[in-house]
Amino acid sequence: MTKVLVTGFGPYGVTPDNPAQFTAEALDGRTIAGATVVSRIVPGAYFDSIAAAEQAIAEVDPQLVIMLGEYPGRAMLTVERLAQNINDCGRYGLADTAGKVLVGEPTDPDGPVAYHATVPVHEMVLAMRAAGIPADVSDAAGTFVCNHLMYGVLHHIATQNLPIRAGWVHLPCLPMVAALDRNLGVPSMSVETAVAGLVAGIEAAVQHSADTREPVPSRLQI
């Protein structure tokens, strides 16, 4: 049976409740398009996150990896197209959960500049929209631990020649976090809505080994 590994992060920075954790946990054990979902919460720290994901890949032996993270300020699910070989959380005024601040450092000095997601990004976005969930394609995964982990997992898969497809979905803040005084006006999305979008997206990823070449209208500005 096909297995899908879903990863999420716990609290970090000024985010006390991470939608990636709650969404990953809600998906754990589900069967989607005949595939079993196995979720793992990984550390929100540079390099530790990659090591934990590599261990989960070895244990679960998935055919598909979908990684989740929060992107404050975005109003919809965003499926990332690229992961860069650069880390810079100093620009955000943030440290990772181990207290580490990286500024302009690569994830792997010998690795390529970037990796493309190997999931059908357009098909996933179209499936999410068809399910009534706002979603878009993104070409900017940031330079914090989300981008770092996406790059690290894709690099691991490529260098180990593993038969695994992998990609990243960013989630808006949770309503309970957007309701905090410091976050008023920040877009949010409930766990239930995010889960519905991920179910549709994972189904598309399981069913489509190649992406559509049809253009996907985009409104993403950040």
Swiss-Prot record:
Keywords: Cytoplasm, Hydrolase, Protease, Thiol protease. The active site is at residues 80, 146, 170. It is an enzyme of class 3 (hydrolase). GO terms for cellular component: cytosol. Pfam families: Peptidase_C15. One of its GO terms (molecular function) is pyroglutamyl-peptidase activity. It catalyses: Release of an N-terminal pyroglutamyl group from a polypeptide, the second amino acid generally not being Pro. Belongs to the peptidase C15 family. Removes 5-oxoproline from various penultimate amino acid residues except L-proline. This is Pyrrolidone-carboxylate peptidase. The gene is pcp.
